[in-house]
Regions:
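Polytopic transmembrane helical bundles with strong interfacial aromatic enrichment
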Residues: 1-237
Length: 237
């Protein structure tokens, strides 16, 4: 039979893997939706508005599942790895708190405004909301990766009374590892979001459904995929 540590690892691994199905997809899809709505504002073509709303609904579902699984994961830091949390919590908790109080609330606030103000705000103002959601999602990723980079390359801390204590917050957020991780994760997310949209649109084109709508969706998805793929190549080199 499995021991307690192995069971904790299995549970945490399952939560993390499931959570990370939705995080990069949400980040990448947010960019695609923002580009679609920007095209609507610039070109005044109704199909781009419909595209932004359609793919935006899929983004909302992914975002919601990502939030729920992320909350479960944070509970497991304390429940599955309580000794580790006690040892490194002074450092590990800081970026997670900043992510929740700054990036997540920014993202959630403007996502709510974006959802409920389609016919109430000037289109140029409304498109700003989704771009702020994109920015907020990237900021969330950054602060999570600050915590992760500390685990890979600990900096800015001292051991005091058997606990790791932060002595240099700037060193923690400027950890060289975080910038490699951030660029690689974000570009990978853009690749995933673009490819998912392009793939689903291509399937609909094969079914001869709403040709103009899905052809434009696939085109934008492929451009985002190209951009993300080049970024992943450069970041992972």
């Amino acid at each position: 039979m499995f021991d307690i540590v192995t069971l904790a690892r299995i549970q945490f691994a399952m939560t993390t893997v499931f959570h990370f199905f939705f995080v990069p997809f949400s980040i990448g899809l947010a960019l695609v939706v923002a580009i679609m709505e920007t095209m609507y504002v610039v070109k005044k073509e109704e199909r781009y508005r419909k595209m932004a709303k359609f793919w935006g609904n899929i983004f909302l579902l992914s975002f919601a599942v990502g939030v729920v699984t992320g909350i479960i994961q944070e509970f497991q830091f304390g429940m599955n790895w309580s000794d580790y949390s006690r040892f490194v919590g002074d450092i590990f908790g800081a970026p997670l708190a900043v992510e929740a109080l700054l990036a997540f609330f920014l993202e959630s606030t403007f996502l709510g405004l974006w959802i409920f103000t389609w016919d109430k705000m000037n289109p140029k103002v409304h498109v700003t909301f989704i771009w702020l959601v994109v920015f907020g999602s990237m900021m969330s990723a950054f602060w999570i990766l600050v915590a992760n980079s500390f685990m890979q390359h600990p900096v800015g801390y001292v051991i005091n009374n058997g606990r790791a204590e932060m002595v240099d917050f700037v060193a923690v957020i400027s950890n060289p590892k975080v910038w490699y991780e951030f660029s690689h994760v974000i570009m990978g997310a853009f690749t995933l979001g673009g490819m998912a949209v392009a793939g689903m649109a291509a399937f609909q084109l094969l079914k001869k459904r709403d040709i103009s709508f899905h052809k434009a969706s696939m085109r934008i998805g492929l451009w985002v995929t190209l951009f993300g793929s080049i970024g992943v190549l450069l970041a992972g080199d």
